[in-house]
Amino acid sequence: MRAPEEVIIRPIITEKTNRLMEDLNKYVFEVHKDANKHEIKHAVEKLFGVKVKAVNTLYARPRVKRTITRRGRVYGATRGYKKAIITLDKNSKIDFMSL
């Protein structure tokens, strides 16, 4: 089993995830690509001291980007990563500003 600091890479904070945090008490994290739901749940409970109700995971695939420059078309790609959507117990809350 990995250390909790290795499992949770960073929180993903966007307008959509802020709405999820406020309305449904769900938090979104980028996690290690080989981490399973049990490791993710254990890591969140240990790092933030909260009670996790559910864990949903998904893989955000890499996207191809292209741009046209003086040298012609240039192709690149974003990296793929694994996301975890954590649903907390209704009495639990994570405050990212105090970290």
From Swiss-Prot:
Its domain of life reads Bacteria
GO cellular component terms, semicolon-separated: ribonucleoprotein complex; ribosome
Q: Which SUPFAM superfamilies match?
A: Ribosomal proteins S24e, L23 and L15e
Quote the Pfam families the UniProt record gives.
Answer: Ribosomal_L23
Question: Its function?
Answer: One of the early assembly proteins it binds 23S rRNA. One of the proteins that surrounds the polypeptide exit tunnel on the outside of the ribosome. Forms the main docking site for trigger factor binding to the ribosome.
For this protein, the record's HAMAP family field holds:
Ribosomal_uL23_B
Matching PANTHER family, A to Z? 60S RIBOSOMAL PROTEIN L23A
Q: How does it assemble?
A: Part of the 50S ribosomal subunit. Contacts protein L29, and trigger factor when it is bound to the ribosome.
The name under which this protein is listed is Large ribosomal subunit protein uL23
Q: What is the lineage of its organism?
A: Bacteria, Pseudomonadati, Aquificota, Aquificia, Aquificales
- Its gene name is rplW
